[in-house]
Amino acid sequence: MEKAKRLDWIDMCRGFIMILVVFGHTLTYNSNLRFIIFTFHMPALFIISGYVFKPRPLKTSGPKYAKRLLLPLYAAGTALIVYRIIRVYFETGRMSDIIYWVKRTFIAMLFASGTDTPKGFTWVHTFGMLWFLAAMFWAMIFLCLIFNHAKKESVRALLCFAGTIIGIVISKKYWLPMNIDIALIVLTYLYVGHFLKNIDLDNKKIMIPLMLVCIVIWGINYALVGKIELAQRKFTIPLLSFAASIAGSFIVIYAAKLVYRDIKVYNPLCFIGRNSMTVLVLHFIESNMIPWNVILPGNPASKKRIIILFILRTIFILVSLTVWTKVKEAYKKRHLKIGKENKLSV
């Protein structure tokens, strides 16, 4: 029962962070609120993944991560290619334009860059927020390799920290395909999440001082305008900003633990958290395929427009997610029923 509760509050935390991801992408680039959200939202997702990580042989965990992370990435990319073929066909009808957009989108999907013209590959275009799926896949592969071959915790910690340093050094010159350099950078986040399992989050004598330290670190970074954007490999005050991203993540994770089951939106947040990768894909789809600028014309910085756009995006994602989960459940039930019937007929 305790395990189920633990997973529930983690799902709730993931769900809250995914809502912030959508909201952060709705805000304008120079928004102060966006700056605050970006100091912790993606690092927190990596830390949570480290928290729930269980070392398994790569031959079993590798296919699982590929199915959970790469399959959605390539499915979304294929859908975007089809969408762009149809759109360009009706807009210009020129085969040269269709070939251009198919080639551009296919290359973007293979690189999975979160920004346009990544360092060392200036001819590559962005694939948007799904950079996270590629980075997470390789990060989990690296983490499995480290944990399978290093048995001492001190060695594991050292290797993860070394991976972060190597990733930062590489990213100074090259932003690698599939965000492999980011995957190395976030190894420290993953290990911090793994280490967090050793801390009693219900022990106030430990958590209150820890939270105070986290608030101070995050507050100093905020006061000094230390920006954090993983897709851009940006830590404007290197050590402080990296520490602040961990501190901010700790604050959000601990807050989720405290308010677990005490808030009215507990179940919806858990639902979103359990399907966080699907939510990210749906967010990618609506960002690229729904003409929000046509539906909601006007100043992108308008508070009214931001709120309405965020509400519409959230509704689309929740409705689509509900339909998707119902279809999956129906398929699984039918598959199990057919399996039982086949066994009986043997």
Give a label for each model feature.
Residues 1-346:
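Alpha-helical transmembrane segments and their immediate juxtamembrane cytosolic regions
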